Amino acid sequence: MNIENEVHIENASESKREPKPPEGLLEDDTIYITTPYGKISLDGGRIQVKDSDGEIVASFPLEKVCTMNVFGSASVSTPLLKHCSDKEVVINYFTNFGKYFGSFVPSRNTIALVRRHQAGITKEKSLAICREIIHAKLQNSCVFLARKRVEVPSLLKELRDRSLHAVSVDSLRGIEGEAASIYFPMLSSSLPDEWRSDKRTRRPPRDELNALLSLTYTMVNTEVISALRQYNLDPFIGVMHVDRHGKPALALDLLEEFRPVFCDAFVARLINKRMITKDDFTQGSRLNDTAFKKYLGFYHDFMEESLKHPRFKYSVSRKKAIQIQAIIFRKAICGELKGYYPFIYAR
């Protein structure tokens, strides 16, 4: 079976949109409403979206919608809310920047089914997913280093290959930890001398490189959380990271495959192109206010840039690539796919 058909991702022609964000998008059984101050209402058998001037900007067939994701200041009419309650349609609310802040959840809803699958995932399936995630992370780490013309250590390649045969999640954690201790010095060596660091430090990061990495991991993790919420997955029920109060374990799991080719690549760009310099930091290795605003602009542009999806071979933004992984994960745990297919570069 063709995974692209199973996942119902947009095809190449559909991805060629105008530069401005779409007013509305129907994908699989989920719709996205991004119209500023939009009015979302019922019109016969369709969900209708009007802009602030009363013009219709989007329309969706009611029977195909299970989840509505509303961004920014758009409002939902009471008749539509009643319909959503009757038909078990979940509405998720996000800020303009994609930060989740709440949901309308009918007493009977699709969230329960997805969460049941999440909570009931077997150890065997969980291990299989973890293998794919860590293998993808280590392969993507090798790809990142190769793109930076850094010789990839043979032990890193060996650990990558061993990850597919790990017999437990604990052994995978050990493989990932050993690989990280090899990878970070190689990442550091690809940067200008004044930026290099001898080890990864957190809470707090002890130098400017670690500060940029920590900030970027946090930013991309927020994207992952938002994507999981959009597909009614609980970001706090993970397969590899330990469940702890306040820790989005599943988001941290899915973040792993994006760390090298999204997070580390972005930080390397900022440094190598002198978009951010050491003068932009305070004494505590934090970006000053002006530099942080610059950083946010650079980050937004980076996440909206198009790349060729390594599996589907058509252009998507990095933000979209993260959403695709949320779809694939949901379908994998619900039995709609044979397994989890990570975001992984062949070379």
From Swiss-Prot:
GO terms for biological process, alphabetical: defense response to virus; maintenance of CRISPR repeat elements
Signal peptide start-end: none
Annotated stretches, region: Disordered: 1-25
UniProt keyword terms in alphabetical order: Antiviral defense, DNA-binding, Endonuclease, Hydrolase, Magnesium, Manganese, Metal-binding, Nuclease
Residues bound to Mn(2+): E176, H241, E256
Transmembrane segment boundaries: none
GO molecular function, one term: metal ion binding
Function: CRISPR (clustered regularly interspaced short palindromic repeat), is an adaptive immune system that provides protection against mobile genetic elements (viruses, transposable elements and conjugative plasmids). CRISPR clusters contain spacers, sequences complementary to antecedent mobile elements, and target invading nucleic acids. CRISPR clusters are transcribed and processed into CRISPR RNA (crRNA). Acts as a dsDNA endonuclease. Involved in the integration of spacer DNA into the CRISPR cassette.
Protein name as catalogued: CRISPR-associated endonuclease Cas1 4
Organism: Methanospirillum hungatei JF-1 (strain ATCC 27890 / DSM 864 / NBRC 100397 / JF-1)
